[in-house]
Amino acid sequence: MLWEILVPRKWNNGRPVRTRHHRVFDAKVRDICGGLTIHPPTIKGEWISTEGTLYIDSTIPVRVSCTREQIEQIMDFTAKHYKQKAVLAYKVSDEVIVKNYPEN
């Protein structure tokens, strides 16, 4: 399956997340499922927490080919790593084809 998860560009206090912090996320995702595709940070969203707080986010869409269990593991890590109250991921496709060409 192909999943997309939205990773925050800023902390809840509005300060930008540093590149080196994102690199730790990238390495963890590679460890879990073998790779990731990072898209340009163009997604802006708004949501209301269970406590009634409005959050306005700018996020980085990250796509991963993995199982349901792996995306949930990635979501759990994302919540802890970025100190998030909620994490959004959604299935993009049920079918993913990867062809390897070792001779190239």
Describe the residue ranges of each PLM region.
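Positively charged, small/polar-rich N-terminal and surface patches that mediate targeting and assembly
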Residues: 1-104
